[in-house]
């Protein structure tokens, strides 16, 4: 639903998550059924092109050249439209932590969570929805995919949590920059990703965010430490924070008891801090 108060007002606390989604998104008469397209028509000319850009990103085409190829538009024109969508707060530009804004690894994502949900689940299923197949859309398209969708949403919540803690000086470092990192690990020659990384110039904080139904295991911590070695040069101290929807295994809890460089944050802690 994003953070728009009017959208949040559509939520009925007496209904289940499934019931709320079906009522607010999956009927042709739903309040949010055409909201994304209506907003685009109000804000931009050629809403069809802008919509195609957002659809491409929602489908996994996140680099500028991928987007322009997908929608069949000139790359310069496409970048102009992407910039406008960024200015509107619908999209955002992202580069791997520590790299320049002009990096060739730059990608674009959907910032507005209502747009992100709409283009992932409503736009692509409009034909089904318009034939009254809302239950099928929920069971076959949304429910099996929702944990994957929530991954990036959870990362954003975790970053907001760290920013709040950092502002109050409640972390082991007082970082001046935070972000996400992806790229090639020179040691393994494989593609790696670190969900959250922050530093204050000499000390680093590395984070992993898991929106899963099972407890986070010790293997996740070991993998995070291995990936963090990419930043071993000029690094004085390292700290690790693990975020988990479903808590932690006993092995992780035992590790934390003997290592104060590891922080654990579960869903209850995140909810308390919101």
PLM regions: where:
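Hydrophobic residues on short alpha-helical segments
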Residues: 47-58, 159
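Short amphipathic alpha-helical interaction segments
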Residues: 71-88
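Short, Lys/Arg-rich nucleic-acid/phosphate-binding segment
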Residues: 95-107
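Short amphipathic alpha-helical boundary/capping segments
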Residues: 35-46, 66
